Amino acid sequence: KILKKQELCKNLVAQGMNGYQHITLPNWVCTAFHESSYNTRATNHNTDGSTDYGILQINSRYWCHDGKTPGSKNACNISCSKLLDDDITDDLKCAKKIAGEAKGLTPWVAWKSKCRGHDLSKFKC
């Protein structure tokens, strides 16, 4: 499912992500846009054999279990397939854990290259 920006915003607010670790909503929205184009079913395979899943491209090496990534930590204690359904609540809970451990959005390559320090006005909720 391709989410509309407003749907994503509503979900982010509901999960208490506005201001979490000092991260503003436009930063979350920008990250989701550049990671997946707001597509809840997005997957991308990495050269290390891991896969990124869902609207925020959560990685199977560390955060979710897909049954095929060697040495997966599954720190969010979730099946990666749950990150591909239309309900993004679990994606956001896991993303919150990731951002909490990193104290920000640095684990997301798209945020570092396309959102950090950029004009985020088009990603306002």
From Swiss-Prot:
Keyword Transport carried by entry: no
Remarks, miscellaneous: Lysozyme C is capable of both hydrolysis and transglycosylation; it also shows a slight esterase activity. It acts rapidly on both peptide-substituted and unsubstituted peptidoglycan, and slowly on chitin oligosaccharides.
GO molecular function, one term: lysozyme activity
Natural source organism: Tachyglossus aculeatus aculeatus (Southeast Australian short-beaked echidna)
A GO term from the CC aspect: extracellular region
Subunit (UniProt): Monomer.
Residues of the active site: E35, D52
The protein's name: Lysozyme C I
